[in-house]
Structure formats: C-alpha cells, structure tokens
C-alpha cells in the first residue's frame, strides 16, 4: 500500500501528477515520556555492559520516563544471562532541588502498601515504631512501592544470616526477631509510620486520592543544613564582587535552562514587575523552541509579611475568570464545592488569571497517566472525570463556587475589580501564623533583632 500523500506511477505516456506538498516536520521527540502501559513508542534503550559478578557481558536497559505529579527519572535494569545476576535502580534526571523534602506516611490499610515510591540514593528511610532506619547512601535508588521498600529491607537483613547462624552469633537471633516484625508490617497488623527524608528533594510518595488532599500523607519542604549540602557535594559559592548599582526594573534578563516538558535547552526571560495595589514580583517565562512548551513562574520580590493572607472569592459568573491572580509558592488553593485542595509548592508561583489557574489545575489532573489505560482504577477515573466536568462548569460560569487562596507568607494576590472600593464577592483576611506554618517558612529559628546580644561577651 502506498504511503499517504505519495503519487503512484501511472502507465507510460500518462500525464505527470503534480508533486505533493512537503510533509509537515515531525513532532519533536520528548526525552522523558510520561509513564504509560499503552505507549508503544516508550521502549528502553539496551546497552551491552560488563557484569561485576562474573565479568562476562550482560545487558543494561535504560528507560527515561516521567512520574505523574513529580519529575523525570532514569530507570536502570541490568541482567546477566551467564550467571543470572540482576540489579535495578533509579536515578533522578533533574537537578538537586532548592529544598529537601520529607514524606511522612501513616500506613493504616493494605491499600497503603501499594503506593508508588521513588527513593533516591540520598534518601533516608525510617519506621519510628520499630526504631528502624535505612541511612542515606546505603542503598541504590529504587522505583517501588511501600511494600517493596519493606521487602528490600528484609532481603538486606537476611543476606548474611546463614553466616551469623554458622558462627553462632548472638545477633542472628535478634535479627530474626526483627525480620518477623518487619513481615508483620507488610500485613498492616497495626498502623505504623513511614518517613522518607531526602535532602536532594528528588524522592516521591504517591497520593492515590489526587487531586484531593491525602490526610495520611504529610509533605514537608525544608532548608538543608551545611552537613547535608556537603553530603550532596554542593559547594558554597564564593562571594561575588559587588557590581555597580543598576536599575533592572526596565530590563528583561535571560539565562539558560532546560525545558520542563522535553528537557531540551531553552531560554528563560526574567523581569521585575510592579502589580497595582500590591507589590513588586519577579516573573520568569520560558519558551521552548524544540517542543513549543511555554510556562511562567512568579517569585516574590519582597519579604515575608508579618501576617498570613486568606482570600475568599465567591465565583458567580464567567466575568470572574478575567481577574488577575498572583499565586506564590507558599500559597495553597481550595475549592470546597469540589472537595479539592492544592497544596503549597504545587504548580509553583504563577501570575495569571483565575481562568488560567483553574485550567492549569484541570490539566494537572487530567494528564495523570495513572488514570488512563489498563493501569487505571475505574473508581478513581470516574472521580477525576467528574472533577474535570465540574471544573469546566465553573470556568464557563455555569456553576457557582468559592475559590480560597491561603498564603501564610502573605505574598499572594487576587484582583479587586471594584478597587478602590470593597468587592462584595471577595473577602480578604489577615491572620497570625501558627508555629507549624512559621516552621515551614523557616521563621522560627530566624533572629533579625537583638542578635548582637548573643555575640557580646558575658559580664
């Protein structure tokens, strides 16, 4: 069969058909494709490599993929047909994040054992109820489940047990007793807590209830200590020479980065912008020439406000979708009518309209590969489809809803279309932050006044 658009040759003497129009350029190949069981083009790369067990040649398979609601990783699998040795590990394909991350999961049912887990080399795993810890850099990274983490720990403890028993080592019996306790955890005989602490910020624990909030999972972002920076191989930058003062408010600065969609080199534009009736912010926009992906992010240009801000807007018609909106990285979003909550740091900082943010939220939910194909859960798929339909109704103005922005740092903003008068459909509240909120912002240990007294000699 001839290819589409080609001209088949006719009999001798026939008129020559006009040449076909040039074919459109092929779509750019993405280095990291979303993980999916139905993507036939997503095939691993096979590389012949040396087996470190028998020193014959084995096969390494590399898969560049993308974890939903997370980022890019490289899955590596080695197998040797000569000695049967095999090994699987993962590596983060992205940079070390600006902050470390700590996942605290309360395991209460067998369903929690099936949560997807990305554990990097630098992540430490703890189970406080058993006083059990797997230190950082003691295991290779893995793409597994909660049950897989425990099974891997059991295998590690059982590895040298025959030698301990042969030597009549007293620790062998205690390790056997501990292994029994770990096996009981796999049956969830009683609730327990799993903590994954990764200073690099590249580990991940799945939220099976997405886009709803997961009450069993607490995600904490924190600033790394100097010891953790050294452990990750990060060196402190030398102080730069003080440049001459420049007015950058009217200039657009550029710096090189990688596209978050296809990981190709791209340019990011950055500019300082004054928002009316608010403050200065830094807007960064990236346009990828390889795949056409566009994104923008907003960073606060000022300090943390003395009080947190909670903005509640009653959406009554489609005209509310045109309101300008600034969502900082520390701002969470809630829509009570949809039982939906978007946590801090998700989607990053954004300067857009209300419609733009709602569409970003809908896209975040509907593009989750775990809700598509044969790997999807029918009940979860129906919930997400219903969520998407209700979100469309809100955007079109056919459904009234409340839109709540809660920013402990006080650096978020929603346009008041009646300014300088009060907006009858919008309520702005200022509140005092809790201890936990100050802890997440890194304010509890920050001393900005009277710190000289601590350096003065004792009299």
UniProtKB/Swiss-Prot annotation:
Region (Disordered): 1-32, 439-459
SMART domains (alphabetical): Zpr1
Zinc finger regions, C4-type: 51-83, 259-291
UniProt name for this protein: Zinc finger protein ZPR1
Biased composition (Pro residues): 19-28
Illness the protein is tied to: Growth restriction, hypoplastic kidneys, alopecia, and distinctive facies: An autosomal recessive disorder characterized by pre- and postnatal growth restriction with microcephaly, distinctive craniofacial features, congenital alopecia, hypoplastic kidneys with renal insufficiency, global developmental delay, severe congenital sensorineural hearing loss, hydrocephalus, genital hypoplasia, and early mortality.
Keyword Nucleus found: yes
Low complexity bias spans: 1-18
Subcellular location: Nucleus; Nucleus, Nucleolus; Nucleus, Gem; Nucleus, Cajal body
Any GO CC annotation of this UniProt entry: nucleolus
InterPro entries, per database record: Znf_ZPR1, ZPR1, ZPR1_A/B_dom, ZPR1_jr_dom, ZPR1_Znf1/2
Gene designation per UniProt: ZPR1
């Amino acid at each position: 069969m001839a290819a589409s658009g080609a001209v088949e040759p006719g009999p001798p003497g026939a008129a020559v058909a006009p040449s076909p129009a040039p074919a459109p350029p092929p779509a750019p190949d993405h280095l990291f494709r979303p993980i999916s069981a139905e993507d036939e083009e997503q095939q691993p790369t096979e590389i012949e490599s040396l087996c470190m067990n028998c020193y014959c040649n084995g096969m390494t398979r590399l898969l560049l993929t993308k974890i939903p609601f997370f980022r890019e990783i490289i899955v590596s699998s080695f197998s040797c047909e000569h000695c049967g040795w095999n090994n699987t590990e993962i590596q983060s394909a992205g940079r070390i994040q600006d902050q470390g991350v700590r996942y605290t999961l309360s395991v209460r049912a067998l369903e929690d054992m099936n949560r997807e887990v990305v554990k990097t080399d630098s992540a430490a795993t703890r189970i406080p109820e058993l006083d059990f810890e797997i230190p950082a850099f003691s295991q290779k990274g893995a793409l597994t489940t909660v049950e897989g983490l425990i099974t891997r720990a059991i295998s590690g403890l059982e590895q040298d047990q025959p030698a301990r028993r042969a030597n009549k080592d007293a620790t062998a019996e205690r390790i056997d007793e501990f292994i029994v306790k770990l096996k009981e955890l796999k049956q969830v005989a009683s609730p327990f807590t799993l903590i994954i602490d990764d200073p690099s910020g590249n580990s991940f624990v799945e939220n099976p209830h997405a886009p709803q909030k997961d009450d069993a999972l607490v995600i904490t972002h924190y600033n790394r200590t100097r010891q953790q920076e050294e452990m990750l191989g990060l060196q402190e930058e030398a102080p730069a020479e003080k440049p001459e003062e420049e007015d950058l408010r009217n200039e657009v600065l550029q710096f090189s980065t990688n596209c978050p969609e296809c990981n190709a080199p791209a340019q990011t534009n950055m500019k300082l912008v004054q928002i009316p009736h608010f403050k200065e912010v830094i807007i960064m926009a990236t346009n990828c020439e390889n795949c056409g992906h566009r994104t923008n992010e907003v960073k606060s240009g000022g300090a943390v406000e003395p009080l947190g801000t909670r903005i509640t807007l009653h959406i009554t018609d489609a005209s509310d979708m045109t309101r300008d909106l600034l969502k900082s990285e520390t701002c969470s979003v809630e829509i009570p009518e949809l039982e939906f909550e978007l946590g801090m740091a998700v989607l990053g900082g954004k300067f857009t309209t209300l419609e733009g943010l709602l569409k970003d939220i809908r896209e975040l939910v509907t593009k989750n590969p775990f809700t598509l194909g044969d790997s999807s859960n029918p009940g979860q798929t129906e919930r997400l489809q219903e969520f998407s339909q209700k979100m469309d109704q809100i955007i079109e103005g056919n459904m009234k809803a409340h839109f709540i922005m809660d920013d402990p740092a006080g650096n978020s903003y929603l346009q008041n279309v009646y300014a300088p008068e009060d907006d009858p459909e919008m309520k702005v509240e200022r509140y005092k932050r809790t201890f936990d909120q100050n802890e997440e912002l890194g304010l509890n240990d920050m001393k900005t006044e009277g710190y000289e007294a601590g350096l003065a000699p004792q009299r």
